[in-house]
Every structure is written in structure tokens, then in C-alpha cells.
């Protein structure tokens, strides 16, 4: 019986990630056949440049796939099985401000952690809800596979504001780290590992890693990580310097709890000062990306569109993103794949807020994710996670209630922010910088000396 | 690489189930190779009659397996990978009293439900702990696969009194009912179904059943069960009348909650009067088994031992018990099989006592079971389960504290017992009947008029 | 400074309790000055006969109090500080059916316990919500002091359907039993006792009783109750036979848990058979009341109205109801009185459903009740209470969702109902009997053989 | 009937607080009669200088009180009704190091908050347990009234390591702040206020303050505090500059949550930088106290002992400490006084760790404290409190398990410590400084770059 083929819309078509993901989808048509692929964005000019290249890729590799790029929600979201969402409200320009404003006050300036993540979240909530509503309006049976950042705040927002929506929140960081673990262990693929992991998004720990036979791989990994972090002795693939620092820093982050292996983003919470020291407040990661990947991708796309051929294209298949296909297939074919998803806790972590959105192993089938219980977590992780989940929940409360006070409280609570005064100064700058993107907040009744 | 082969001891070697299970093990040597098989029992005379036949089976079908039957704990439990426990403290004679005493007062008289289950539990706790202690003394790395009844009370006792023991509590009733569901659905095996189920042992509900592609099979099953119970239109295999009544009664039990499919044992709690009406206080199920299966198995074993051949044997392979092999393989080879096990709740059912032993789907690997979260259960099931788990916990508290009062409270709480007076009368009879098996209870300070 | 005086409306003016309560209010004007007293009922003819007498009482004892009896909600609920609610939807006639229908099937027939309480609850919810809405419409700052039965179901309904309403649910049974305890102990008033108590309404236990100096009075009380129940050696006041049986039966109920002293209503759950045995299905307590108190009160009221004098009145001050004044004063004057109220659990009982309405000691002030924590309750009480609270919650869910199925589940769960079939038969009779009072339930999809 | 009089031992007799407290006790003999007063300390030389003066006070004011100062536990703790504990293990010298070491790294250096509190806690646990064990050995019916700091860590330690001990943990900070609130409101005493408050010790918030009639005093207080902090317009009593800064800083701390009024210690967590800025790493509060109060008290005591008269004594009655008498009287006479105590949460705060030691209003009687439920707390306070309670619990776990790793985790988690590296550096210095007082910790397996 010929496998059913699917209709996909990529929300955030103008993203620099779109070409690599389209190539990845075209590379997995065997397992995941596609009949229709659409790009949707609210920035027509930007999306058309990306779409030009994707059109060439598809005509060359799978001409029978119906392809369209549109800014019309009805066209984009009608007759769709899956929405693959990687939107970035405010694009890199706003990300630069997210990073630079905190650094002005000596505070971590990062895309999803600390004040930057809060600012980015306050922009993203409206965007993700909008797309979710389009999906439910035009394709009520569709699923949204959301890997838009900051996933933690977006996931809490969809839990609170769209509790019954068919949205799966997933993050690629654990995938990337597990790829490195596999290299460190000499395995051919991370899929040879069975892992137990828990935390919030960008804020978690591996507690058990076995091979297929059930042998415990943690001792070997811990031994390696305690010396080299997540840098394999022989790098399969060269990475940018800043990523290399991150994987090396895992060494110190792991020292804080030798019983586990940490998600690398914890560096921003446990060693914020080190992060600030190596940041340039006037030229942050966002600037690197704009000058690096964004420039590269758009120049390549223009060239492919111009030459109506991908022959000279240097754009690589983003196979690292194949977890999106795994997730889509799990829903489509009830595969029961074991994947880390961001889901409502509801008892999975026994001694943690049942309404928190936690990142835990799930068995994914056509009915969605079945979280696997974690049990009780140690006090160190509970203390860190309760603090951080309160930041995320207060941010969503602030967005929903247009509350300056609650957003200030979110910043005060963040482990990356040293005190309430700096929190207030950063917030006032962020309000100003985001006035075109955030809901208008009520005026805080309180001043501090 | 030649698969590792295992050493097994069957605790309760003298059980009538042993021959069928040994035949089943011999039928599954391909997937689960065995190097040594021992029977252990504290009733030498009874075990030797069973062992005689098993010896013949093994010599005929797998002569290289080292076989022994012993009443010496050290011999039995040394160099063992798995203990397969199906003990019955007090044998069928006491089960007959468990059933007859309550019936004397018009109350359900059943092996594991109501006062009978409480009495049986009070006998079994000591027996299971004893075996567990032998295992940990002589083979500290071994696992106990316990399907001794009453599994709910035994599981609560091991949780409370041996919290760190490597014991897996499992029950074959859901396996049996799922076999029938598969027949009703026209599937070749229950393993083609992916199920979601929750409850206490002998006290649970299926909430979702899909085929491999994720299609919802519940509507079809509910339609069938609401008319015929768990009786397929064409019975694959004739069953005893009393089992047939049970599978038919599922029809009425299911009516109490049309959203789910019930475990058949719920009939004793929702329709106790019907159960009592069709029981004969002087000739209960235990008597049927003694006159039926027990007599049959022992005569067959004597014959096989006499003829030193299984040629004329009518003892069938108990393939229904192959779930035991599935469980052993999951531990041995880290298969990650999805099975219903009785595990500590600890958040799996979000709105239920975290310390309750609940029967839920688990992913089973070499580290043991990983329960899959159930989420929040409806008020009807919560009310029934909280009442019943209190019966089970009070029984274990009564055993541990030798408390007549707590055992009376357990009986008062049972849905099968109409009032505190009858609970008291039954308890006093059971105390008398079990004085050789139960711990000696303190004298209750209270009388009732 | 002259104490503020209050405006009261008694909802359920036509109740036989109204005259005694009015006399009690007039007897407590010193502590609780009243400027305006209104009676409200939806049965004008019945209320006018009661109002006639009350008019005489007020003119004789406190002529400056403005008095009115009305069936007009706006008039009744405008300019009101307190609504004192003792409504009985369906009056005694329906209560008779509540009691007789279950008895037909050998099941407890009682006003607030078992099927009778469920039926009464299904009538009362709408009535209490209606009054609450009138109060909030016409006197938004007022408080409703609700002692309408069945208080447990009414309290759960107001929690779920009017979560922010200023309603205090209180019951007089503990007050009555504590009065008797005081007599047993030789104290002049129950107010010399400091008690710790927990449970659901009509379903609780005293765990600690001290005198003012902190001496433990439990041993002496337990000693007495274990022999005589709640019957003091010398009765201060003769009670009706049925009440006497109830207070005597406490002896057996207490035996089920010698560590506590029980609420007498537990007799219907622990000794339902004894209750049924002494009931006459054709002449229940409701009939006794109609023939007894109801006839007496209305004849007395007619006489007082006729004679325009209370001189020959035999209607007594209902000082037992002075707890209503205590509660009103606590709100009015922020007295911080310690009283048993029915409040949302929310942690008061640590190991019990946080959304359950539980009866626990509270400190009552102008902001309402502050529940005192109970801590963790034993397994016996938890099992009983979880079962019973599920009955109450399912009844309110059934009312809100018009669900025949959920009401059947409520009856199945009740400890007083022996099995699902009898539950179904009783339900079908009750549906028929209450078609003028209950919401119209959907048709249950299920039949049982 | 002549009131019973009591035997008291003050543990930490050599404390500078002892004279003021003894004078306070002598000033309250009417409400709390004392027959025997003993001082106990393990520093004889220091205690004798204090005892000399106390001996004079007692002979002058209540000669019939039996007085003794001893370093012998049996003598001190025999025939005792109450142990009043204000011990300081390591005295002010170690407190100076607690404050100076963190300041070396730009981190808050304070007696009970941040690294200083953790270091002080690691010294105090052993000391308080020792005294508790003496009390239970020699006067098993006695109660310990503990106001030794750091009360939060000491309370968690006694909860975990002595769960059944009769110890009441109380703190005087809320008392001091409520005194100031009363002045701000123009009330004669804080006892005219009924408060609702929750938090951890030195980490809480007032949520409701009423006068006796139930009028809401919060608006007026919030208005004042948002401008002047806790500084009344006319100071009843001049305070030291550092205390004045603290009460003024409440203004900024309150801005973080305008719905509540904060405990002043929150300044160290919300404005750590401001605290560090005004600290002199070489001359901290401990030095001020040694040079100030300690020198003053010991010189005064020497003079009183020399002159065998208190005539020229400038030592004031520490009436601020009369809360200790209130607490003792509540136990002794079952007064049911409403006081803030540090008790096991166990549901009092519904959405917070049930095993946390929380500071909440309690009704105190002869059976000990009955916590009043708080209900659910907002996300901001929950985030802050979960982080801080994890610091406290990890400190006690580190003490009990002699774990360097867990103590490092406690420091990492503290909101006052900027990152894991500084946490590590501070810890290594504190280990060195406290080697005579802390248990010897295992060596951490981990290093950081």
C-alpha cells in the first residue's frame, strides 16, 4: 500500500534555516513522502529570496512536490498536515539588542537565556499564537512541530493560552549534544543510545545513557566530559569558535553535579561572569550570525535563483534537523519513537510544579507524546529549575496581563541578573527597544532609589 | 556473538502452574536461552511430584540445561539471574477458606478480591519477603519477577518493607483480556495493539487501544464489549464456565464507565451481589481448581515420571505465560518492551497517592521499568481506587504492626463488605482460620454491639 | 461608639426553623444588634404563616427592628449585610421520597447521606446558586451564611460554580455533639473546649479536645463514648428517640477508630444495615418531622398570629443555632473566633484532594475563614473520605453537565449502595420523582443486564 | 489557685543578649512566674562574667528565684520546663570571618544571609542538636524555644535529624518590624494588629494587616513604606545607622512586589550589590558588634558584679524579646496566642515543598503550634523561596553527609552568589576558616578551570 504523503507549511519561511531544512526534507522523502511544501512568512521580500532557491531545489530533486511561498495565512495553512515553525519575531536585529542591552550592565546577553531570552519570549508569544490560530482555523487536524525559540517561554505560553492545541515543542540542543556524545563514545549514531534526561528547555541534565544492550555509558562519558567537555578527541565536523567554547565549558558546568551530564546552556546560569567576559557588548553573537550565516545563505539563494540551478550551491543539508522528520513520522506513522519533548509536567517529575513545561523523554505516537516518568529530582536541580520556571511563567503572565511589575519580577528572579536595580534598568531599556513588538505594559506603580 | 544464557529458579516449584511454565520456557529457548533451571519450594513432597515431570521435559527437549529441585534456599538461590515467583502460602486449602468464610456472611468470596484477597495477602507477605531476602543474600544482582497473588498487596508490602529490592510485580489478567481483545478485533496477536491502561492490580481500565498505524480501536471494542463483554464471536479456545461468566459480565462492568474498557475483576466490586448469588459457599472456585487442574496436573506428572516420557502427557505449554519471558528478556537484553507492570506511582498518575502501587504501561529495560505518565484520572476511578488502595495499604500496615484494628479498618473500607459489623465477624473467623499463617495480631481494644 | 447594627435576610423564611432562629437572634441583640430583618421564600402562602408569628415576636421584643416577609428577590436582598440561608428545595414531601425510594431497595434512606443526600443535593444546587446570585446582584458586599443541607454537596457546588462568592458553609451537627461532650465532661459550655477536627461535612472525626488549660479531655470522652456513645449520664434535655439512637450508635462507630471521636452521621456509612433495619420504608424521618415539628410550628404560628401575642407560644428559642450569630459576629467584628467551617482544602489536609471542601477548624475574621492546618490524615479516614468526596464531586459534575452517567457513578461509589445494579434502579426512580426539580439529564448510553 | 512557676535554662548563657533577656523575664514574672533560672554555656570564663550581673539582678528583683550558671549539661538541663536557646557557635570572631570572606569576592557578607549564613549554619547544627539531646535526656517533657540563628538552617536540621523533638523555632525580626509598623500606624502595640505572613525565615512577606475591627491597614502601611521604608515619621527609639539603612531599604525591596510588605532581610537577596557597596570587608557588622554591644555588655556586667548592684547599670530590659515569654506562656497556659513560627509546611503553603520549614502564623497552645493555612503563593515568591529553601536543605544535607559537593551546590544556588566559580572560591576559604567547627567534608571529585 503506497505510503500516505504529506502537506507541510514552514512558518518562518524567510529564516536562514529554511534552505537547509528543505534540503533535509528532500533527503528524507523515502521515510517521509511530501506532496505539498509551502513557505509562510509575514516578510514577503525576505521570504521570496529564500523561496527562489527552494523552488530550484524542489524542481531538481522532487518536481512532483507542489511548492508555494506565500504571506497569505489562508493559502499557507489550508490543507496542511504539519506546520514546522521556526519563526523569529524581530529577526536578528532585535536579537542583537536582546544581547547588547544586558551586556551594557555586565549581564549575560544571550539569545534565549537571561534578559535576552525574556525579551525574545515577549516578542515570540504573539507570533506563535497567531500561527497556531491560523493552523486551527484552516487545518484543524494538523499538528504544529514548534522549534522556535525561546522554546521554554513559547511552550509555557501555548500551555496556558492554548491548552488544547495540537502543538509539540521540541529543541535541537540535546540532539546536537547527543551527536557529540556518540562521537565521544565511538558510536555511529546517537540513536544507539537510550537516554534519561530531565529539565526545562535549555536547562536540563542527562542522568542515564545506555547502549542498546543496556551497558552504562555514563562513566566513560563523565570521564571524558570532566576533562574535555563535549569536544570529541577527533572532531567529526569543525564548529565555530563560540560553539567550541560552549562545548568545552561543559567541563566546568558538569563539575557542579558530577552525577549528571549537563545541557550546555547551563553555562549562562552557573558561569554568567565568564560568559560576559568573553562577550563584546557592541558585537554579539547576533552580529556574527548576520555577518556569517545570514549573509552566506542569502547570497547563495540569490545565486541559485539567478542560475536557476543548485549546481554551485554550498548550502548543506541540515541533517542535524532530521529530528523534525523523526517527530513528524512518529505522529504520522505512530512509530512510538523515544524523543525529548517539552511537555506539561503533570507528575512526570514527581517533586516539581505539575504545570511546568519540562523537557523529558517521551514515547511519541499518533496521539502525541506519552511522557516517561522521571521520579523525584535532587534538591540542587529542583532549586535551579523552580527559580528558572518562575522566570518563564512570570514572563508569560506579564505578556498575558500586560504587567510591567511581573516582567520586572521575572528579571529579578533570573540567576543571570545580579540584583533588582540592574533588573529594572535592563527592563526599562528593553521596553523602549521592543515597543513595536511587545504588548504595551501598564506603568509600574513602583520606583526604586 | 553467542547470546548469554541464564539461570532461573522458580519459587513455588510445587505449583500446578510450574509444568506449563517450564514447557513455555523450553519453547522460548531461542529468544531466552537457559543454562540452569531450579525449582524451590518449602513442601518437598509436593514439589518432587512436579519436578519428576519437569525433569523428563528438560531431558527430552533441552538436555544441556542443568535442572534441580530443592527445598534448600542456599542451593536454590545461589548463582541465579532471575527468580520467577508464583508462591501460594497455605495452598488451595486456605484459598477455599478465604472464599467460604466471607460467603457465610453473604459477602464476595474470591481469591484476590474482598476479604479473601486480604486474608491471602496477610499470608503471602511473609512468604514473598522471605524469598526476596534469599535472593538478595545468595544472588544480589538477580531480579525477582513476581506474579504471585494477591499482587497488589504483595507489591505494596515490597514497596514499604523492601523499597530498594530488584523486584518486578506483574499480573497476567490484562494479558489474558488483551488476547481476547485481539481475537475480537481479528488481530493475530495482542502485540499488534498499543494500549494505555491504569489502575491498581485487578482494578484498572484501558483508556486507549490503537493498532500499529495509530488507528483507534476503542470504538469497535466498546461496541462489542457493550453487547458481549470479552467473549469473541468465535472463541479461539474454550474456557471454563466461571471464566466465561466473568468475560461476559464485563458487559455490565463497562456500562459503569462507557469511556473505558474495564479489568474483569471489577465485577467483584461493582456487582458483588451477582457474584455472591452464583457462588456456592460450600464449594467455591478453590474446590473446582483442586478437583480440576490440581488433580489433573499431579496425575499427569506422576504418569510422566512413571513412564519417564512426556509422550502421553496432556499438559499444555502455558504460552499465555510467555509475558514472563518478555519481562525477563526486557531486563536481560534491554529490549525496551512496553508492558503493564505494578510500580510505585510517584507521579505517573498525577492526582493519585504518589506512594500507591499502580498498574501502568512501562518501558522495560536493563535498569528496570520506566513508567509512562497517565496524567489526571477522572473522579469515578479516583474514588474507587483511593478506597481500594487504602484497603491494600491498611492490610500491609496491619501485617507490619500486627494490628487487629487496622485489619478491621481494611475490611470496613472494602467496597465488597456491606458494613463494619459484617467486617468484624468475617475478620474474627479469618483470624481463627489463619492462625498458622498470619502474624499474631494484638487484641483490638474495641467491641461493637 | 454605638455598635453598628445589621440587616439580615433569612432565605427559606417558610422553614420550620425560622421562628426558633428569629427568637435566638432577638435573644442575642446585645452582641449582634439588628436594624432590619427580612424573610424571603418562593412559597408565599407558607412563609406568611411563619412571618405572622415572627412579626409578633419582633413587635414584642424589639419593635425598632424593621421587619418584612417577601417573595420579591430585589426587596429581600437589597441593603443586606448577611443572608442566613436554610432553604429546602422540594420541602419535606420530597425529603420523604429521598428516604423512601432507597429503602425500597434495602438501602439507607436518609436526608443527607447516601442516595437521599445525592437527590436532595441535585435539588438544592440550583436553589442556593439562585440566592447567591440575588445577594451579589443586590448587596455585593454581603456575606451568605449557609447551613442549608446537604452542606457538603452545596459547598462543592459553590466552590466550583461560584469560586469567588462570599459564602460561608457551616453545619450545626458538630455544635450539637460538642454540646453533649461538654455535658459528659461536666463543663458549662462547649466553648470551654478547644477542638481539632477534620473530615467532610457529616463525615468527620475529632482528634483532640482540650480544656482551656490544655488538659487532654479525649481519654475521658473516649472512655464514656465507648460505653454510652454521646449520651450523657444525665440528659440536660430529652431528645427524640431517633436522635437518641443516633447518639447511642456513636459507641459502635467510635470502635472503628479508637484514636478519634466520630461525627454521628458516619453510622449511615459504617452500619448502613442497622440503619435500614430500624427504618420503615413507608414512614420515614421526614414523615415524623411533618407530623411532628412542622405541624407543631405551623399550629403555634397560626395561634400567635391569631392572638397577636406570643403569650401562649410554646416555640422555644433555638439557642443551639447561636453558632450562626457567632459566625456573623466573627465577620462583623473580626472576632477571630475558632469555628468548624466547610472550606476548600487547599493544603489544610496535606494528603487529601486540594480542591475538596473539608470541614476543619478555622479562625474567622472580617476577611472570612483562615483554615488551621490538619497535617496528614491516617489511611482509614483517607480511604473513606476520598470515596465520599468523589460521590459529592460527581454529583455536582452531574448537575453541571446534566450527566445521567456521572450521577449513576456517584451512586455506585457511595458506601451505602451495595452494587451498581441497585444504584441504577434507585437512580431511575429518583430521576422520575425529581423531574420537577433536577436539571433534565442526558440519556445514559449504557444498559446493564 | 497559685499559678505554676517554671524552671528555665538559657542555653548560650555567655551571650550578650542574656542580661537583657533575664531582665525581661524578671519584668514579666507576673504573667510567667519562674522558680529556677540557669545559664548554660560551654565557655565558662565568658559565661561567668555575664552570670555575675544576672545574679545581682535576680537577688535584687526576685530573690526567691533559684539561680545557677553551669557548663555541666546534666546540671543545666535537669528539672527544666523550657530551654531558651540563643547559642552562637564560634562567637563573633567566626561571624567576622563569615562576613569578611564573601566580601573578599564582592559577595554579600552577612550573619545569616548568603555564604555567611551557610557557614554559620554549618557550625550551629551540631551545637543545637547537642543541646536538644541534653534536654531530651535530662528533661524529656521540656520544650526548646529556639531563636538561635541562622533559624532557617537550624529549623531544617532539627526537622530532618530530630523530627519528633519538642522544639519551637521562632525569629524576632518580624516582631521588630511589626513594632515599627505599629508606630507608623499610630497604634500602641503591634498586638493590635492581626497579620497574615508567609515565607522562609528571614525571607518572607506580610500579605494582610488588620486592626482589631478588621479594617485593612495595608494601604496606609504600603503608602508609608513605599516612601520611607520601615522608618516611622517620629522614631520611638534611635537605632544604629546600619539598622536604619536596613529599615529605609525596605522601600526598594517593597517595590519588587507592591502587593506585600517584605521582611527586611530580603534586601540581601534583591539588592546584594548595594549591600556590598556599603560594607567594609575589613570591618564588618561583627566588628561593630564586638566593639559596640559586646564591649558594652561585658564592661557593664563586670561593673555590676564588682559593685554587687545594678544601680549604675545601663543594661536595658530587652522587652523586644518578650515574644519569648509569649511563646512560653502559650505552651504553659494553652493561650492559643497567634504567633509567627518556623514550622514544617505540610500543606500550610499549598504550592510549596511540604517538607520545607516555613514561617507562617500559628495558633500556639500546650500541644505546640497549629499553623494557619496560607493557600497558594504567587510565582515570584515561589521562585525565590524554592531557590532559597534548596540552599538551606542542601546545607543540611551537606552537614549530614559531610559532602563538599552539596555545600558547593548550596552556594551556587544562593541568589547572593554570582557564579559557580566564586561559590567555589568562597567555599574553599570557608572550609579552611571553619576547620575547627565544621564536620570534615569529603574531598570534591571535581575541579573547575
From Swiss-Prot, chains A, B, C, D:
Q: How is its activity regulated?
A: Cellobiose-6'-phosphate and 6-phospho-beta-D-glucopyranoside are not substrates but competitive inhibitors of GlvA.
E.C. code: 3.2.1.122
Q: Where does substrate bind?
A: 95, 149, 285
Q: Which SUPFAM superfamilies match?
A: LDH C-terminal domain-like, NAD(P)-binding Rossmann-fold domains
The effect annotated for residue 111 to D/G is: Loss of activity
**What induces this one?**
By maltose; repressed by glucose.
Provide the active-site residues from the annotation: 172, 265
Q: Altering residue 41 to E/G: what's the impact?
A: Loss of activity
Q: What class of enzyme is it?
A: hydrolase
Task: Give GO BP annotations, semicolon-separated.
Answer: carbohydrate metabolic process
Q: Binding residues for NAD(+), per the UniProt record?
A: 6-72
Listed A to Z, the keywords are: Carbohydrate metabolism, Cobalt, Glycosidase, Hydrolase, Iron, Manganese, Metal-binding, NAD, Nickel
Q: Where is this site: Increases basicity of active site Tyr?
A: 111
Q: Which cofactor does it need?
A: Mn(2+); Fe(2+); Co(2+); Ni(2+)
Q: How is the cofactor bound?
A: Binds 1 divalent metal cation per subunit. Manganese, iron, cobalt or nickel enhance activity. Binds 1 NAD(+) per subunit. Is only active with NAD(+), not NADH.
**Which cysteines form disulfides?**
none
Function, as annotated, reads: Hydrolyzes maltose-6'-phosphate and trehalose-6'-phosphate. Is involved in the catabolism of alpha-glycosides accumulated via a phosphoenolpyruvate-dependent maltose phosphotransferase system (PEP-PTS). Is also able to significantly catalyze the hydrolysis of both 6-phospho-alpha- and 6-phospho-beta-glucosides containing activated leaving groups such as p-nitrophenol and does so with retention and inversion, respectively, of the substrate anomeric configuration.
> What is the official name of this protein in its record?
Maltose-6'-phosphate glucosidase
Provide the species name. Answer: Bacillus subtilis (strain 168)
Q: What is the lineage of its organism?
A: Bacteria, Bacillati, Bacillota, Bacilli, Bacillales
Write the gene name.
glvA
Amino acid at each position: 500500500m503506497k505510503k500516505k504523503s504529506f502537506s507541510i507549511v514552514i512558518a518562518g519561511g524567510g529564516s536562514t534555516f529554511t534552505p537547509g531544512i528543505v534540503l533535509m526534507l528532500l533527503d528524507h522523502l523515502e521515510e517521509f513522502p511530501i506532496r505539498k511544501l509551502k513557505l509562510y512568512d509575514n516578510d514577503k521580500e525576505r521570504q521570496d529570496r529564500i523561496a527562489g532557491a527552494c523552488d530550484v531545489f524542489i524542481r531538481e530533486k522532487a518536481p512532483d512536490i507542489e511548492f508555494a511561498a506565500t504571506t497569505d495565512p489562508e493559502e499557507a495553512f489550508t490543507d496542511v498536515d504539519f506546520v514546522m515553525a521556526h519563526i523569529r519575531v524581530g529577526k536578528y536585529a532585535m536579537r542583537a539588542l536582546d544581547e547588547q542591552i544586558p551586556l551594557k550592565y555586565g549581564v549575560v546577553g544571550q539569545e534565549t537565556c537571561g534578559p535576552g531570552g525574556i525579551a525574545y519570549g515577549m516578542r515570540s508569544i504573539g507570533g506563535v499564537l497567531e500561527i497556531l490560530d491560523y493552523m486551527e482555523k484552516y487545518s484543524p487536524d494538523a499538528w504544529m512541530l514548534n522549534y522556535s525559540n525561546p522554546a521554554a517561554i513559547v511552550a509555557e505560553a501555548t500551555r496556558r493560552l492554548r491548552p488544547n492545541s495540537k502543538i509539540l515543542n521540541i529543541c535541537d540542543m540535546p540532539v546536537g549534544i547527543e551527536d557529540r556524545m556518540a562521537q565521544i563514545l565511538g558510536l555511529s549514531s546517537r540513536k544507539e543510545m537510550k537516554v534519561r534526561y530531565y529539565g526545562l528547555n535549555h536547562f536540563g541534565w542527562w542522568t542515564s545513557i545506555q547502549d542498546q544492550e543496556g551497558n552504562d555509558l555514563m562513566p566513560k562519558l563523565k570521564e571524558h566530559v570532566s576533562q574535555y567537555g563535549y569536544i570529541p578527541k577527533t572532531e567529526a565536523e569543525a564548529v565555530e569558535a563560540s560553539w567550541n567554547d560552549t562545548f568545552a565549558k561543559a567541563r566546568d558546568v558538569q563539575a557542579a553535579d558530577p552525577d549528571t551530564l549537563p545541557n550546555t546552556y547551563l553555562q549562562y546560569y552557573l558561569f554568567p561572569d565568564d560568559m560576559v567576559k568573553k562577550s563584546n557588548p557592541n558585537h554579539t553573537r547576533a552580529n556574527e550570525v548576520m555577518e556569517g550565516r545570514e549573509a552566506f545563505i542569502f547570497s547563495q539563494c540569490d545565486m541559485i535563483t539567478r542560475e536557476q540551478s543548485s549546481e554551485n550551491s554550498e548550502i548543506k543539508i541540515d541533517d542535524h534537523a532530521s529530528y523534525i522528520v523523526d517527530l513528524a513520522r512518529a505522529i504520522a506513522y505512530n512509530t512510538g519513537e523515544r524523543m525529548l519533548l517539552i511537555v506539561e509536567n503533570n507528575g512526570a517529575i514527581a517533586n516539581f510544579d505539575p504545570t511546568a513545561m519540562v523537557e523529558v523523554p517521551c514515547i511519541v505516537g499518533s496521539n502525541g507524546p506519552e511522557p516517561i516518568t522521571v521520579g523525584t529530582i535532587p534538591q540542587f536541580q529542583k532549586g535551579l529549575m523552580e527559580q528558572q520556571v518562575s522566570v518563564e511563567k512570570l514572563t508569560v503572565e506579564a505578556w498575558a496581563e500586560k504587567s510591567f511589575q511581573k516582567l520586572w519580577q521575572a528579571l529579578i528572579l533570573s540567576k543571570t541578573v545580579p540584583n533588582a536595580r540592574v533588573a529594572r534598568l535592563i527592563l526599562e531599556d528593553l521596553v523602549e527597544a521592543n515597543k513595536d513588538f511587545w504588548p504595551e505594559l501598564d506603568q509600574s506603580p513602583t520606583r526604586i532609589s
